[in-house]
From Swiss-Prot:
Protein name: Small ribosomal subunit protein uS11
GO molecular function: structural constituent of ribosome
Gene Ontology biological process: translation
Matching PROSITE patterns: RIBOSOMAL_S11 (PS00054)
PANTHER family: 40S RIBOSOMAL PROTEIN S14/30S RIBOSOMAL PROTEIN S11
Residue ranges of coiled coil: none
Family the entry assigns: Belongs to the universal ribosomal protein uS11 family.
Annotated Gene Ontology cellular component terms: ribonucleoprotein complex; ribosome
Alphabetized UniProt keyword annotations: Ribonucleoprotein, Ribosomal protein
Annotated Pfam families: Ribosomal_S11
Length: 151
């Protein structure tokens, strides 16, 4: 079918961090990696954290629910995010790694390490790596009851 007359295809507008950056200078963003045991989020923002540049989860990359938190899904998500960052002009990332935290587990899920590795392997420079898992100072009672979880 021929394209309609008078209807020009829309051109996708690409934001660039162009002229204000010198050659060879790194443009930083912040990669917030949230790795629970059910899913892995890779969310890149600007340095202030207000403007989202890309956000991809493990669940967006695989079909089976059980694979959402897998290292493979996290790797695919991180590769997608890296491609989007390069389009915009971000060349380096500070990484903020987070587990579920609070009164739940403080250990990052299986996708955390592979997401970080995939970002580095896809050409992004890594600045600082910081653990921002929420640590309770005093909180509500943990799940499991008085005698704890019986295995």
């Amino acid at each position: 079918m021929a394209p309609r007359k008078g209807k020009a295809p829309k051109e996708e507008q690409v934001i660039s961090l162009g002229p204000q950056v010198a050659d060879g200078e790194n443009v930083f963003g912040v990669a917030h990696i949230f790795a629970s045991f059910n899913d892995t989020f890779v969310h890149v923002t600007d340095l202030s954290g207000k403007e989202t540049i890309a956000r991809v989860t493990g669940g967006m990359k695989v079909k089976a629910d059980r694979d959402e938190s897998s290292p493979y899904a996290a790797m695919l998500a991180a590769q997608d995010v890296a491609v989007r960052c390069k389009e915009i002009g971000i060349t380096a990332l500070h990484v903020k790694l987070r587990a579920t935290g609070g009164n739940r587990t403080k250990t990052p899920g299986p996708g955390a390490q592979s997401a970080l590795r995939a970002l580095a392997r896809s050409g992004m420079k890594i600045g600082r790596i910081e653990d921002v898992t929420p640590i309770p100072s005093d909180c509500t009672r943990r799940k499991g009851g008085r005698r704890g979880r019986r295995l």
